From Swiss-Prot:
GO CC entries: extracellular space
Main location: secreted
Protein name per the record: Somatotropin
Superkingdom as given in the UniProt entry: Eukaryota
Signal sequence range: 1-26
Subcellular location(s) of the protein: Secreted
Function: Plays an important role in growth control. Its major role in stimulating body growth is to stimulate the liver and other tissues to secrete IGF1. It stimulates both the differentiation and proliferation of myoblasts. It also stimulates amino acid uptake and protein synthesis in muscle and other tissues.
InterPro entries associated with the record: 4_helix_cytokine-like_core (IPR009079), Somatotropin (IPR034975), Somatotropin/Prolactin (IPR001400), Somatotropin_CS (IPR018116)
GO biological process, any: response to nutrient levels
Family the UniProt entry places it in: Belongs to the somatotropin/prolactin family.
Encoding gene per record: GH1
Organism of this sequence: Delphinus delphis (Short-beaked common dolphin)
Keyword Signal: yes
Origin organism lineage: Eukaryota, Metazoa, Chordata, Craniata, Vertebrata
């Protein structure tokens, strides 16, 4: 029987539906392990959504013979690469949890503006059928990261520092080649940045709570 995978899926769905920690002094407070579990699940969900959308956009609009060259142009440059954030798991393991949370927060906040235009670009997308909710999902993950920061710092919430330079808005004029290239580059950066945030959160969760699933 497939009771194992089904149980795991139901547990993951239940965790995604859980609220974040209560206000200070409220009861009951969510354990730190649950905060990390929720954040990792949300980051994984967003990263997969971004990856699926990138692939769908690529299949629909970018000729296969042009994909490699386009990916190596300035259109594929992500300005988040200019911040001193770890580029992979090994580098992330050299940073403190608080540093990784701050980098994760910066990455998430840099997309809060641009993703509000996704629903206009992908109105007929099967993968992004709920694109108007991506902003809500990002805000939810932002809230979870801030809850973790409150727990790991001094217990008092800090105002999240939004990157001074955020990504451009997605272009809704899908008949323009320039708009297609711009959106293709943005989707590539969105996927890369969410992968970074997911990696940071998984590294933190694994080194705090020893698990058999830490290999990734």
């Amino acid at each position: 029987m497939a009771a194992g995978p089904r149980t795991s899926m139901l547990l993951a769905f239940a965790l995604l539906c859980l609220p974040w920690t209560q206000e200070v002094g409220a009861f009951p407070a969510m354990p730190l392990s649950s905060l990390f579990a929720n954040a990792v699940l949300r980051a994984q969900h967003l990263h997969q959504l971004a990856a699926d959308t990138y692939k769908e956009f690529e299949r629909a609009y970018i000729p296969e013979g042009q994909r490699y060259s386009i990916q190596n142009t300035q259109a594929a440059f992500c300005f988040s690469e200019t911040i001193p954030a770890p580029t992979g798991k090994d580098e992330a393991q050299q940073r403190s949890d608080v540093e990784l949370l701050r980098f994760s927060l910066l990455l998430i906040q840099s997309w809060l503006g641009p993703v509000q235009f996704l629903s206009r670009v992908f109105t007929n997308s099967l993968v992004f059928g709920t694109s108007d909710r991506v902003y809500e999902k990002l805000k939810d993950l932002e809230e979870g990261i801030q809850a973790l920061m409150r727990e790991l710092e001094d217990g008092s919430p800090r105002a999240g520092q939004i990157l001074k330079q955020t990504y451009d808005k997605f272009d809704t004029n899908m008949r323009s080649d320039d708009a297609l290239l711009k959106n293709y580059g943005l989707l590539s950066c969105f996927k890369k940045d969410l992968h970074k945030a997911e990696t940071y959160l998984r590294v933190m969760k694994c080194r705090r709570f020893v698990e058999s699933s830490c290999a990734f």
